[in-house]
Amino acid sequence: MTTMRRRLTLVTVAVLTVVVVGGRVRQQMAIESRDQAVTAKDLRILQKADALLKNASVWNRHDDRVCDDDEAGGKRSLFCALQKADREILGEYEHRNVALQEVRFAIQDATRDRQTEMVIRALRQFSLPHRLMDFNNLPETRFEDVKQVLRVATERVGARLNRSKQ
């Protein structure tokens, strides 16, 4: 009887593990989808982040993903500008919302030839790769590059928003 009970427990644990892991994989795949539904708020977040980074003098090119000190110093990284815009538009920060994901996708597209370098640099610092921070901190990233990924993300969200209205 106890052997049967152990097998049943083992099978139950195995099934639950598959369900949980499968759910996380599906969730991650949905987050990384490039055709998520967009809203006017997504567009406003991108526009606000772009406005916050009005010129190179307010850009912090050494992001650590801690934004309070950036705000106090009057400079923002790409990540911190998006975080501030997110909070202003949504009332809270949502790490994986569509607006931020679109910027991540624009970064992936702009840095296809440097993806390996970004991952290696992150691993050397014993951290997981963070596309927004890693792109911001690449030595060859210029302020114009930051503005360009915001522009690309804004155009993509705007185009999808217009298509959804038709």
What role is predicted for each listed range?
Residues 16-33:
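Bacterial Sec-dependent signal peptides at the C-terminal "C-region" and cleavage site
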